[in-house]
């Protein structure tokens, strides 16, 4: 899968990234790099990572997602994983995936609602 297929869209102060259905390791690495570059370039306050099309999760993908969540947090942003399928949730749990302070939402609309309504850690 070509890394050029990764879409990172800035909407107001947030980034929306839709993960391809079956990303290989190269695509997952490129996704992380593009997210971090966009966070730095735009100074965004949050990331919505739409994983609704993802059907399987391997250990590299799980680890990279967890690392990306942590890196976004270190850059001052918050992350919401949107649209996680039940099978992916089961696999993530079996792999011991911890998301730190990332939030989860059933879909992208709810993810944006969470980021727009939740207070930032700076104000807590």
What are these regions (language model features)?
Residues 42-45, 49-98:
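Amphipathic alpha-helical interaction surfaces in cytosolic regulatory modules
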Residues 4-32:
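STAS-typified acidic loop motif
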Residues 1-10, 120-124:
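Non-catalytic signal-transmission and effector/linker regions of two-component phosphorelay proteins
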Residues 3-5, 92, 107:
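Long, hydrophilic "mature protein body" segments
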Residues 100-111:
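Short acidic-hydrophobic, aromatic-tinged amphipathic segments that line or gate anion-handling sites
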């Amino acid at each position: 899968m070509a890394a050029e297929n990764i879409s990172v869209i800035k909407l107001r102060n947030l980034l929306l990234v839709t993960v391809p259905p079956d990303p290989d390791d190269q695509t997952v690495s490129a996704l992380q790099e593009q997210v971090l570059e966009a966070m730095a370039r735009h100074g965004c306050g949050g990331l919505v990572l739409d994983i609704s099309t993802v059907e399987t999760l391997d250990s590299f993908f799980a680890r990279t997602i967890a690392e990306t969540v942590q890196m976004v947090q270190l850059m001052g942003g918050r992350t919401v994983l949107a649209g996680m399928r039940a099978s992916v949730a089961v696999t993530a749990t079996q792999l011991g995936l911890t998301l730190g302070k990332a939030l989860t939402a059933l879909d992208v609309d709810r993810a944006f609602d969470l980021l727009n309504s939740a207070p930032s850690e700076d104000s807590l």
